[in-house]
Amino acid sequence: GSIQLVGPMRQYLSCIGEVGLAIHRHRIRKCIYVESMMVNWLGMIKKKDVLPQIQKYVSEGMPRNWGLFECCVIAVDLSNKLAIKILEEWFLEFKNGAKRDQLSLTYIIWKNGFKPNTIGVLNPKGNVSNNSSIIWERGKKHMNELTKYKGE
């Protein structure tokens, strides 16, 4: 899909949390393990590509239902050293992992000892799909299936 920013982004500066980031919460799921199963089931990633990454997260103690972020729009305070650390580690995790930004960013935030509530929320009353400052054209192929299963 594609993202088009149609509203002022300045409004999101006040949303940035203590870690220096503000992100949309996932509109349906709150677990990277369920998300990994969904994207595999939908054919968006192969099991052989995501399984080692998920096994690593399990072995390190990443809890189920810890939270899940949608990474299509992120507000960042580039003067915040924590934000820079998270972004650098996220890049490496993404580069060396299954190329699923939602899984790797959520893991990196958890691995650094932060809680989901330390990350600012873009559109606190909703999510990316109902944010009036964003037009999000998702690929129609998977959209119906993605919204069916919450994984609870």
Cite the ranges covered by each PLM segment.
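Glycosyltransferase catalytic domains, chiefly GT-A lineage
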Residues: 3-152
